[in-house]
């Protein structure tokens, strides 16, 4: 019965092709032992090579050593090449700040990929079953998840990780092992309700089965499978939109154009953000729905220059026209400069890669000129002492129509990104600020009906 069911799953989801080289995660428990036995029976039909990999987590002492001996003997009897590795998982988790579940899973998969690369295999087979599927969906519901989380465990992931017994129930697996006298090892920690998954397996699902629906496992999985095709379609659309709205400059950096992003449906937005994080980290582990919602809140124009920090050192910055996601904090390095400016001539500001050009002329000539936004004019007779162009300083103020305003507050009002503020030149005379770049002119130096001479300043990029 199981053999036919597994073969059907393999064919339906195209999990194995002739000539595949497969690394099988072998814990010694019923699931992985059943999977090994079934694939070994299929070995000749598919012309596949099977290699087994076992990790001793150094958690269960002598029992863990017995597990390793058991799987070693099992592989020897079947003629399967066997790899074993021993790692102090508790110590690793303590150093990395991970739970035992998270750390053990991470180390197992690292070992699987290491062996896969070493022997040039192309598949990794994992013994997840139907009950695991239901437990995973329930865990994600309680943690908070979207449609992608509800679709549960994939039959195949990254064109590499396959789960051939995902349609098989745990009790069927146990019966199979008994029928073939496989005598798998039983991890007693799986019988202790100290982990979230164990509590779902041992307490929640049995309670639901006894009090609500005797077929609750099948119902959860059926729901999960029905959502999968919907999710797959949306994911495909989201991937295309991600490419359209994102500027991917380098590994670890994604900039999302807000004009395009805000027009998307929320279902697509969520996936665009997840794709952004996946581009940076390689996956979206430990980034859940609330983190995605926090990023989406940055659409609001009142959030310009806000910054978020997500798990695994993802930094999110709201710029004027974009949202930036990166794995490196953007450090604002202050640029300092100070130059005396001639009344007529030009000066090169190498720190800004700009040329500042100055010219004194009559008011009539000034009014006859066609000026663009890069030019500013001031009443030359109101200028006191020499003209200086410099970087901003703490406490800088400029006189505006409504009174004096701190330059820092002016930058905030103008929504100038924090890292750009140090690049805006401040032009002063001996009495105060004449203008802040080409953004604002002080009321004290503006042209009026009494102006006879104008100081024209041009801000030109090199």
From Swiss-Prot:
It is an enzyme of class 6 (ligase). It holds the Pfam family ATP_bind_3. It catalyses: cytidine(34) in tRNA(Ile2) + L-lysine + ATP = lysidine(34) in tRNA(Ile2) + AMP + diphosphate + H(+). Keywords: ATP-binding, Cytoplasm, Ligase, Nucleotide-binding, tRNA processing. It is found in: Cytoplasm. ATP binds at residues 27-32. CDD domains: TilS_N. Its main location: cytoplasm. One of its GO terms (cellular component) is cytoplasm. Its EC number is 6.3.4.19. One of its GO terms (molecular function) is ATP binding. Ligates lysine onto the cytidine present at position 34 of the AUA codon-specific tRNA(Ile) that contains the anticodon CAU, in an ATP-dependent manner. Cytidine is converted to lysidine, thus changing the amino acid specificity of the tRNA from methionine to isoleucine. Belongs to the tRNA(Ile)-lysidine synthase family. The N-terminal region contains the highly conserved SGGXDS motif, predicted to be a P-loop motif involved in ATP binding. This is tRNA(Ile)-lysidine synthase. It comes from Clostridioides difficile (strain 630) (Peptoclostridium difficile). The lineage of its organism: Bacteria, Bacillati, Bacillota, Clostridia, Peptostreptococcales.
């Amino acid at each position: 019965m199981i053999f036919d069911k597994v073969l059907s799953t393999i064919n339906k989801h195209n999990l194995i092709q002739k000539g595949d080289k497969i690394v099988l995660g072998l814990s010694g428990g019923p699931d992985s032992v059943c999977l090994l036995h079934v694939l070994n029976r299929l070995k000749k039909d598919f012309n596949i090579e099977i290699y087994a990999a076992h990790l001793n987590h150094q958690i269960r002492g002598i029992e863990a050593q017995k597990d390793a001996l058991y799987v070693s003997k099992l592989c020897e009897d079947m003629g399967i090449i066997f790899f074993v590795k021993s790692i102090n998982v508790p110590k690793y988790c303590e150093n990395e700040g991970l739970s035992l579940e998270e750390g053990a899973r991470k180390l197992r998969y690292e070992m699987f990929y290491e062996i896969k690369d070493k022997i040039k295999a192309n598949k990794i087979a994992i013994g997840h079953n139907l009950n695991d599927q239901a437990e995973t969906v329930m865990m994600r519901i309680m943690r908070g998840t979207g449609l992608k989380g509800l679709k549960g465990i994939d039959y195949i992931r990254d064109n590499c990780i396959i789960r051939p017994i995902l349609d098989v129930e745990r009790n069927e697996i146990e019966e199979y092992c008994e029928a073939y006298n496989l005598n798998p090892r039983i991890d007693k920690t799986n019988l202790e309700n100290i982990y979230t998954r164990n509590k779902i397996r041992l307490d929640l699902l049995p309670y639901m089965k006894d009090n609500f629906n005797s077929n609750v496992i099948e119902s959860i999985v059926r729901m999960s499978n029905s959502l999968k095709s919907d999710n797959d379609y949306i994911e495909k659309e989201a991937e295309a939109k991600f490419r359209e709205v994102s500027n991917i400059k380098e590994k670890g950096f994604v900039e999302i154009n807000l004009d395009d992003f805000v027009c998307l449906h929320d279902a697509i937005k969520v996936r665009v953000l997840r794709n952004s994080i996946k581009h940076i980290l390689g996956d979206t582990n430990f980034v859940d729905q609330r983190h995605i919602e926090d990023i989406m809140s940055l659409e609001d124009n009142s959030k310009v220059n806000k910054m978020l920090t997500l798990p695994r050192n993802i930094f999110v910055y709201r710029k004027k026209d974009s949202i930036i996601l990166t794995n490196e904090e953007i450090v604002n390095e202050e640029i300092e400069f100070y130059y005396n400016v001639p009344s007529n001539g030009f000066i090169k500001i190498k720190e800004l890669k700009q040329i500042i050009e100055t010219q004194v002329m009559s008011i009539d000539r000034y009014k006859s000129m066609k000026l663009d936004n890069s030019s500013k004019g001031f009443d030359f007779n109101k200028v006191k002492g020499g003209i200086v162009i410099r970087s901003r300083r703490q406490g800088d103020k400029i006189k505006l129509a409504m009174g004096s305003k701190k330059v820092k507050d002016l930058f905030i009002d103008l929504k100038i990104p924090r890292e750009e503020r140090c690049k805006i030149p401040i032009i002063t005379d001996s009495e105060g600020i004449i203008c802040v770049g080409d953004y604002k002119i002080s009321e004290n130096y503006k042209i009026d009906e009494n102006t006879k001479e104008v100081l024209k300043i041009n801000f030109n990029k090199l």
